[in-house]
């Protein structure tokens, strides 16, 4: 398990919940985790995903984020810094999708 730290705490939905980090399942022996990703993982390994919001909303949001991050990583198997540059926009996009989904429920 590794944890990718967001560049800043991202306000989610109602304003009482923040995403501080995203947990990502990657085998510990994966040699493609190099450079900056390794540094981030070591520094923030103990950071928890801290959210105080409806569980179903959180699950939808994380599913959207993880799908986008997995696509990002498959395009950048060397785990370059683009993953970090794009992380905020990935989460912002996921939040918008989840908010639209909530309006349609």
Per-region residue spans from a language model:
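Eukaryotic intrinsically disordered, low-complexity regulatory linkers and tails enriched in Ser/Thr/Pro
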Residues: 1-105
């Amino acid at each position: 398990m590794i944890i990718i730290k967001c560049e800043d705490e991202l306000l989610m939905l109602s304003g009482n919940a923040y995403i501080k980090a995203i947990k990502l399942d990657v085998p510990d022996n994966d040699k493609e985790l190099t450079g900056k990703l390794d540094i981030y993982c070591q520094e923030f390994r103990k950071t928890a995903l801290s959210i105080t919001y409806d569980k179903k909303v959180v699950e939808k949001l994380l599913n959207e984020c993880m799908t986008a991050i997995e696509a990002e990583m498959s395009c950048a198997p060397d785990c370059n810094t683009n993953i970090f540059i794009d992380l905020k926009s990935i989460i912002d996009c996921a939040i918008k999708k989840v908010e639209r989904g909530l309006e349609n429920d």
